[in-house]
Amino acid sequence: QDLPGNDNSTATLCLGHHAVPNGTLVKTITDDQIEVTNATELVQSSSTGKICNNPHRILDGRDCTLIDALLGDPHCDVFQDETWDLFVERSNAFSNCYPYDVPDYASLRSLVASSGTLEFITEGFTWTGVTQNGGSNACKRGPNSGFFSRLNWLTKSGSTYPVLNVTMPNNDNFDKLYIWGVHHPSTNQEQTNLYVQASGRVTVSTRRSQQTIIPNIGSRPWVRGQSGRISIYWTVVKPGDVLVINSNGNLIAPRGYFKMRTGKSSIMRSDAPIDTCISECITPNGSIPNDKPFQNVNKITYGACPKYVKQNTLKLATGMRNVPEKQTRGLFGAIAGFIENGWEGMIDGWYGFRHQNSEGTGQAADLKSTQAAIDQINGKLNRVIEKTNEKFHQIEKEFSEVEGRIQDLEKYVEDTKIDLWSYNADVLVALENQHTIDLTDSEMNKLFERTRRQLRENAEDMGNGCFKIYHKCDNVCIESIRNGTYDHDVYRDEALNNRFQIKGVELKSGYKDWILWISFAISCFLLCVVLLGFIMWACQRGNIRCNICI
């Protein structure tokens, strides 16, 4: 289909941008939904379902909890001196030794998990006048009665249990973690049978702290054939400090210390299988990619992970505003420029030209403006990731029953942080999308203005993104306009001459209306004059008589 007013002495050049039949809706500051040619999802909403063992060292706890592995439960001996970046506790983990409790369980678990090692150093404690290496049928090691391998159960020797007073200095340059305990017999008879005294006492001190525990004698629910309990305590001895242990009974003594390390190690409860793969980010649901800035898989993470948000989807515009091409038009229609719609089928660029001249029609992309837009958009995703990825882990928070209010406060703080980040993510993406659309629109306008400045008076802006060129412009001429080498002076005289000739025949639509109305008014006036003259002539000849009655 020819463009209006086109012939061999003129040409038409239209500027346009890429469009797709079905774009993607994104949110901007000014619009909740605006269609763009392309967008990237920013929220990771699914996991692989498995925990990758690379680059992080993953230690599968299997049927052992971290504390059981720490104490040396017989069925956890395989974990002695192990190290990890992430210790994975399973839901089927169980204890299989003398029943115990840890009054500050969460703190001990977190301390050991962050240390990332169960490296144990045996020390030569001297326990005089007592029997060492006590055991229980509740803690079988093979066919024999046993006990926690990292603890030493001290009982009476003969009929005496002397007061124990032992010191152990820390002459090294690292922190030492000592695990010790207090036995709570189920009856008074058990108390005297094991420790002679009717009531024991255990005091463990350093220069910075002191703990004194008095056993609580009494029956408790039976667990693995035992109604007594052991309470587990722990003490950290700094370099240059001294550990002092004083007791007259009921002491579960340390055999040595755990070497403490500082680092980013952690612990996570998960039943996801561990597999040979690579992933920087781990959640209880499994590993997730960290190529997106946000995720809503799980609040608990380890490694370099996307920020957790509430949204299921946030789309970042990576293309321009999409205005699908009207399908009723061909390559050239009544309106072919970017003002009304985009162009589908532009596979080699975002912006381009369509022309019609004496040699036919054609289309070509403008790579300069396309590259300028792409360069500004390409770094957006990486910049958003850099702003949001956490280079640390979000650990599980655990509190005892007496710390219920602290737990509620912690939950409130975490929920508030998530709400804040979810809002920030929404605003951040909306701002980036607004910028993308504005800059792609700007590149289109720059290309149009650059073309208009080249053509000057040799062409007329048709108001729809097209120029009517008033001189013969073959394909070489069109190419010179596209690449910026067009010389308007060469065609100036021809363009002016053709413009005057065409304007002598063509009338712009605005003047046509005025002329039509004026012509209609003059015609009506002349018709009235002729009709009135005929009536007056007829009256004079007597052919018409007029009677006026009052």
From Swiss-Prot:
The record marks 329-330 as: Cleavage. A lipid is attached at residues 539, 546, 549 (S-palmitoyl cysteine). Its main location: virion. The keyword Disulfide bond applies. This is Hemagglutinin. Homotrimer of disulfide-linked HA1-HA2. Binds to sialic acid-containing receptors on the cell surface, bringing about the attachment of the virus particle to the cell. This attachment induces virion internalization either through clathrin-dependent endocytosis or through clathrin- and caveolin-independent pathway. Plays a major role in the determination of host range restriction and virulence. Class I viral fusion protein. Responsible for penetration of the virus into the cell cytoplasm by mediating the fusion of the membrane of the endocytosed virus particle with the endosomal membrane. Keywords: Clathrin- and caveolin-independent endocytosis of virus by host, Clathrin-mediated endocytosis of virus by host, Disulfide bond, Fusion of virus membrane with host endosomal membrane, Fusion of virus membrane with host membrane, Glycoprotein, Hemagglutinin, Host cell membrane, Host membrane, Host-virus interaction, Lipoprotein, Membrane, Palmitate, Transmembrane, Transmembrane helix, Viral attachment to host cell, Viral envelope protein, Viral penetration into host cytoplasm, Virion, Virus endocytosis by host, Virus entry into host cell. Belongs to the influenza viruses hemagglutinin family. Glycans are attached at residues 8, 22, 38, 165, 285, 483. Residues 536-550 are cytoplasmic. GO terms for biological process: clathrin-dependent endocytosis of virus by host cell; fusion of virus membrane with host endosome membrane; fusion of virus membrane with host plasma membrane; virion attachment to host cell. It is a single-pass type I membrane protein. Major glycoprotein, comprises over 80% of the envelope proteins present in virus particle. The keyword Glycoprotein applies. It is found in: Virion membrane; Host apical cell membrane. It comes from Influenza A virus (strain A/Duck/Hokkaido/10/1985 H3N8). GO terms for molecular function: host cell surface receptor binding. Disulfide bonds join 14-466, 52-277, 64-76, 97-139, 281-305, 473-477. Palmitoylated. InterPro entries: Capsid_hemagglutn, Hemagglutn_HA1_a/b_dom_sf, Hemagglutn_influenz_A, Hemagglutn_influenz_A/B. Residues 1-514 are extracellular. The gene is HA. The lineage of its organism: Viruses, Riboviria, Orthornavirae, Negarnaviricota, Polyploviricotina. Pfam families: Hemagglutinin (PF00509). One of its GO terms (cellular component) is host cell plasma membrane. The chain crosses the membrane at residues 515-535.
